[in-house]
């Protein structure tokens, strides 16, 4: 099946204000997800970062509904009394009938109100509700699948809550219920089955069957049309889960996915074309470092260098000033996340650097949590040796400084032969002896429980990257999430990313991809693929992604070997960049953070909610998408300072000046003039055209005023703003032809 990329009709900056005429005074939004105040995966990040923008739009009429977990409530939620009489009556009614429902405020930016349903306390009704689910939806749930049983309990409790809230409300409300993922989907199906007056939205962040198929080494994207979905789900013993997901997708008034690539996947696996694509954003303010992100990179890199000094003690025969730090991070899905491709490319990169006599060294980190039982003793010893050497050096330095001070105080130059005594030399020799090491530095920082069958370690043994002195590429596998309290690498994830030079995410299955997005907003170049939602989004909106530090690896139309070769080419060309070029590229990368801000991507969610309201309450709301001229489409321009040929960006002299290497002064251009990133950004923005907003929404009820939200007012700036929700309904049809 051909998977052609199509541009959005109106994309990006310079947009006029969105004249949103929806009156939300009598509308209430409930966002339902298993990961509300309950960190499990990426949906938690979506909800957490989007909460402020959604709260600005809906105000006190915005609520999140999730499961009650003791850990989550203790650390993330402040329990409160219900703020309205209708809500208080709803909670009291449910609690009096054997449920346990809690209300509070989620302690994140925006402070959204949350309703937490205790799933375990309602287990007494599980069998009855499973019977009702079978009678209503013909979906049977086996007793042994605890996660699916929890989904049934959560779905029935959610529907009970929404129905009770509508019954207890004295005025007629227009309720929107937005359900995320299959774990919350049963509630949506029951809302429709019980004919509750609720506008429903279902968002799938990744299809169940797609994730299972890709993990099984299937040629997924070339066979989407050919899968017997019922058979495939049954063979993997997830048929009941698949039915939950598919039923929710078909029952929803509006069905959305997080990326164009997932929209195509949903069309064939869930048998419904998504109405809108709702890309995931980030709270860019959280990562904002003003103009100091270059300095933050240097500070964070210094923390990583300290770890490297300890880890490679005894084999530290490479120059840390000429060392680049690459990393891959995420869930430990060896093939889906592209760790197999990355390792193969590192082996080829190692060969290229060695045969070309490069002085550059690459340290590649794999941050993927796996089953371990403790830290590696050699790794701990390395950090202890490093700290001991540092203490020894400081002791000698203090003694040397004191003698130098005394000598200068009396007006004479010191005798250098007497500055250090025999004890000092003995101390230093002991320190040098402590750095002697017979074995190679360890590849893994922890003791793995299944060392012999671990896919990363098995591949490393095959390709022979053992951190030997001859290798220009070193590998460090850190099978645990990063923490600032770790005795090995005491940095949190954000600080670690800032200190690296390149994030590598060659995923085969990645519906969106928050890791490269986080790199972008922190000004760190990254490699993504055209099979990830993020990669497709950036490829669609940027004329020359690589010039901005966004490298898009082709895994759609290339074989695995060709993809490895292309990734090797990306890595090798990055290693050939000068420090000056990397500084300029980081500036450009950081500028793209505007593309990923919820202030702009939040419009897609707003459009989905307005579409749902118009479908559920057509007598009060209308939603009329207008076709836009394809010529209005816009892609972020190529940077004005990028030369037409890479050869023109090389130095005429093999040596760089100190001015060029100082990020505080800014790098020099080829003619010797100072490079000004703000001036370059202004040039880009002058090229931006302002396409007309392609659709209008309105409210036909007899209310006087309309509620302008902060998301709309933010568009008066000239930052990069997506103009319309990407509707895959037409483009998916084109891709089938």
From Swiss-Prot:
Functional pathway: Glycan biosynthesis; glycogen biosynthesis
Alphabetical GO biological process terms: glycogen biosynthetic process
Protein residues bound to UDP: 39, 331, 515
Activity regulation as described: Allosteric activation by glucose-6-phosphate. Phosphorylation reduces the activity towards UDP-glucose. When in the non-phosphorylated state, glycogen synthase does not require glucose-6-phosphate as an allosteric activator; when phosphorylated it does.
Biased composition (Basic and acidic residues): 682-695
GO molecular function terms noted in the UniProt entry: alpha-1,4-glucan glucosyltransferase (UDP-glucose donor) activity
EC number: 2.4.1.11
UniProt key word Phosphoprotein: yes
Catalytic activity from the UniProt record: [(1->4)-alpha-D-glucosyl](n) + UDP-alpha-D-glucose = [(1->4)-alpha-D-glucosyl](n+1) + UDP + H(+)
Broad EC category: transferase
Composition bias, Acidic residues: 658-681
Sequence positions bearing Phosphoserine: 8, 11, 412, 641, 645, 649, 652-653, 657, 698, 710, 727, 731
Compositional bias (Polar residues): 698-714
Keywords, sorted A to Z: Allosteric enzyme, Glycogen biosynthesis, Glycosyltransferase, Phosphoprotein, Transferase
Residues noted as binding UDP-alpha-D-glucose in the record, renumbered to the chain: 205, 211, 331, 510, 512-513
GO cellular component terms, semicolon-separated: cytoplasm
PTMs per UniProt: Phosphorylation at Ser-8 by AMPK inactivates the enzyme activity. Primed phosphorylation at Ser-657 (site 5) by CSNK2A1 and CSNK2A2 is required for inhibitory phosphorylation at Ser-641 (site 3a), Ser-645 (site 3b), Ser-649 (site 3c) and Ser-653 (site 4) by GSK3A an GSK3B. Phosphorylated at Ser-641 by PASK, leading to inactivation; phosphorylation by PASK is inhibited by glycogen. Phosphorylated at Ser-641 by DYRK2, leading to inactivation. Dephosphorylation at Ser-641 and Ser-645 by PP1 activates the enzyme.
Segments of this protein annotated with the region Disordered: 634-737
Sites where the protein binds alpha-D-glucose 6-phosphate: 291-292, 294, 297, 301, 501, 582, 586
Residues annotated with Phosphothreonine modification: 700, 721
Subunit structure: Part of the GYS1-GYG1 complex, a heterooctamer composed of a tetramer of GYS1 and 2 dimers of GYG1, where each GYS1 protomer binds to one GYG1 subunit (via GYG1 C-terminus); the GYS1 tetramer may dissociate from GYG1 dimers to continue glycogen polymerization on its own.
Function noted in UniProt: Glycogen synthase participates in the glycogen biosynthetic process along with glycogenin and glycogen branching enzyme. Extends the primer composed of a few glucose units formed by glycogenin by adding new glucose units to it. In this context, glycogen synthase transfers the glycosyl residue from UDP-Glc to the non-reducing end of alpha-1,4-glucan.
UniProt protein name: Glycogen [starch] synthase, muscle
Organism whose genome encodes this protein: Pongo abelii
Name of the encoding gene: GYS1
């Amino acid at each position: 099946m051909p998977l052609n990329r199509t541009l959005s009709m109106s994309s990006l900056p310079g947009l006029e204000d969105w004249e949103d005429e929806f009156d939300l005074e009598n509308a209430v939004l409930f966002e339902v997800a298993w990961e509300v105040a309950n960190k499990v995966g990426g949906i938690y990040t979506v909800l957490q970062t989007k909460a402020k923008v959604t709260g600005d739009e809906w105000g006190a009429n915005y609520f999140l509904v999730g499961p009650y977990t003791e850990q989550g409530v203790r650390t993330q939620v402040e329990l409160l009394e219900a703020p309205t009489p209708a809500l208080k009556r709803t909670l009291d009614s449910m609690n009096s009938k054997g449920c346990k429902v809690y209300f509070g405020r989620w302690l994140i930016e925006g402070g959204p109100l949350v309703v937490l349903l205790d799933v375990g306390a309602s287990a007494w009704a599980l069998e009855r509700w499973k019977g009702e689910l079978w009678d209503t939806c013909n979906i049977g749930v086996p007793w042994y699948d605890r996660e699916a049983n929890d989904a049934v309990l959560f779905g029935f409790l959610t529907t009970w809550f929404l129905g009770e809230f509508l019954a207890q409300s004295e005025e007629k409300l227009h309720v929107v219920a937005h359900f995320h993922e299959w774990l919350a989907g049963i509630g949506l199906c029951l809302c429709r089955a019980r004919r509750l007056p609720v506008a429903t939205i279902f968002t799938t962040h990744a299809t169940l069957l797609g994730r299972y198929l890709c993990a099984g080494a299937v040629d997924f994207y070339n066979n989407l049309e050919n899968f017997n979905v019922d058979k495939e789900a049954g063979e993997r013993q997830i048929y009941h889960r698949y039915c939950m997901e598919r039923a929710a997708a078909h029952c929803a008034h509006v069905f959305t996915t997080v990326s164009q690539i997932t929209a195509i996947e949903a069309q064939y696996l869930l048998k419904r074309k998504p109405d809108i694509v709702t890309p995931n954003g980030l709270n860019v303010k959280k990562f904002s470092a003003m103009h100091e992100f270059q300095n933050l990179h240097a500070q964070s890199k210094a923390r990583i260098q300290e770890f490297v000094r300890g880890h490679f003690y005894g084999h530290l025969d490479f120059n840390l000033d000429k060392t680049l730090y690459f990393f891959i991070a995420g869930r430990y899905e060896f093939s889906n996340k592209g760790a197999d491709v990355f390792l193969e490319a590192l082996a080829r990169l190692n060969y290229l650097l060695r045969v070309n006599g490069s002085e550059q060294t690459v340290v590649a980190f794999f941050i993927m949590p796996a089953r371990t039982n403790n830290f590696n003793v050699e790794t701990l010893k390395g950090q202890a040796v490093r700290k001991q050497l540092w203490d020894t050096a400081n002791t000698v330095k203090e003694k040397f400084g004191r003698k130098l001070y005394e000598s200068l105080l009396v007006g004479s130059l010191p005798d250098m032969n007497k500055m250090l005594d025999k004890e000092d030399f003995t101390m230093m020799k002991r320190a040098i002896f402590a750095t002697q090491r017979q074995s190679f530095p360890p590849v893994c920082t922890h003791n793995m429980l299944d060392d012999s069958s671990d896919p990363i370690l098995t591949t490393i043994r095959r390709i022979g990257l053992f951190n030997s002195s001859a290798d220009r590429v070193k590998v460090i596998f850190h099978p645990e999430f990063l923490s600032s309290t770790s005795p090995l690498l005491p940095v949190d994830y954000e600080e670690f990313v800032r200190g690296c030079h390149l994030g590598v995410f060659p995923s085969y299955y990645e519906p969106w991809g928050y890791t490269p997005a986080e790199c972008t907003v922190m000004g760190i170049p990254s490699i993504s693929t055209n099979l990830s939602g993020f990669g497709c989004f950036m490829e669609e909106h940027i004329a020359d992604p690589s010039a901005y530090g966004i490298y898009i690896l082709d895994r759609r139309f290339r074989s695995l070997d060709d993809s490895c070769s292309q990734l090797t080419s990306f890595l090798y060309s990055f290693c050939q960049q000068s420090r000056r070029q990397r500084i300029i590229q980081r500036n450009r990368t950081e500028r793209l953070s505007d593309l990923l801000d919820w202030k702009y991507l939040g419009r897609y969610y707003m459009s989905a909610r307005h579409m749902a309201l118009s479908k559920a309450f057509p007598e009060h709301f209308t939603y009329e998408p207008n076709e836009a001229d394809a010529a209005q489409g816009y892609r972020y321009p190529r940077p004005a300072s990028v030369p037409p040929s890479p050869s023109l960006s090389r130095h005429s002299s093999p040596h760089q000046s100190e001015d060029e290497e100082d990020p505080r002064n800014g790098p020099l251009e080829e003619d010797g003039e100072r490079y000004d990133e703000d001036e370059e950004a202004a040039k880009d923005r002058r090229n931006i055209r302002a396409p007309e907003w392609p659709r209008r929404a309105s409210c036909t009820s007899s209310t006087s005023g309309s509620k302008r939200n902060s998301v709309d007012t933010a568009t008066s700036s000239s930052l990069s703003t997506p103009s319309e929700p990407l509707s895959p309904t037409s483009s998916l049809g084109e891709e089938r032809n």
